[in-house]
Amino acid sequence: MIKITTKLGCLLAGLLVLSACSSVPQPNNEYAKALDDTKQVCAACALVGNDLLVALNKSCDTPMTPETLTSVMNSNPMFAAMMAINSIGGTDFYQVYRDAAIDTLRCNEMDSWPDRTKERFQQPDMQKALALRVSARQQKAN
């Protein structure tokens, strides 16, 4: 009888822990919701904010949370530059510029990140990448 009671108690305790854990929102779910909410208000903001935060997460271990997404959009100097590029330059230009931004990311030097990115973007290999993207898109259209 004691064995059955102990096993039943352990099973109930385990189920209680699992149900408690499943009811706590996971950071990924919270982030996805924040990103979706941002998309509804400003799709370009969500695109640029997410692209920058993904790069910061990979290179600088910046957590992917609603708070860091908001912080990137409000205070990261690259956000305004990337928003301008996205709205003026179109998809091809934006994607190559984003790649240049990723290449020049230095975790402790955020203030000079836009200048480094601009210099990197002007390099011949980046200009060639842009030309190839534009050419490929034009060929698809024809």
Task: Briefly describe each language-model feature range.
Residues 1-11:
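Bacterial N-terminal signal peptides that target proteins for export
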Residues 4, 27-28, 35-36, 75, ...:
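Intrinsic-disorder/low-complexity regions
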Residues 17-20:
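C-terminal motif of bacterial Sec signal peptides marking the signal peptidase cleavage site
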Residues 22-24:
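Bacterial signal peptide processing site
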Residues 29-88, 105:
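Short N-proximal segments of mature Sec-exported proteins
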Residues 67-142:
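Compact alpha-helical subdomains of small soluble proteins
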